[in-house]
A protein has these predicted regions:
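Enzymes that bind and transform nitrogen-containing heteroaromatic metabolites
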Residues: 1-121
Length: 121
């Protein structure tokens, strides 16, 4: 499974279950990468998501699931829980200094084979 995340200069990924910024370039990048895929999302993140056309959603719960997932799109606990299964990690670095309440996850369990891609917006 691949993962995609956006983080600002201060290490924040969100506030109140939403993004701190609205970066059109990053949103186009997100759509391009995830279009046609099956997305894994945590419940809190799901509750604030807009409709994502041409993508299926699987909402992470405490129960195990046995679906083929293409992308993990957050939130923080979902990233941390599934990070050992990431084959790719796509990180958008947003040039923004807003204070949030959710910080960049601790990916200590990434496999040695996980490829990391960085983008700047």
């Amino acid at each position: 499974m691949k993962a995609i995340i956006a983080v600002n200069n201060l290490g924040f990924i969100g506030k109140g279950n939403t993004l701190l910024w609205h970066n059109k370039e990053d949103l186009r990048h997100f759509k391009k990468l995830t279009d046609g895929g099956i997305l894994l999302v945590g419940y809190n993140t799901f509750s604030e998501l807009p409709t994502l056309s041409n993508r299926g959603l699987i909402i992470d719960t405490r129960n195990e699931f046995y679906f083929d997932v293409d992308w993990c799109i957050g939130g923080k606990k979902t990233y941390e829980k599934y990070s050992p299964f990431f084959t790719e990690l796509h990180i958008s670095h947003i040039d923004d200094n807003q204070i949030g309440d959710v910080t960049f996850p601790n990916f200590i369990d990434l496999s040695a084979d996980c490829k990391i891609y960085n983008y700047n917006y």
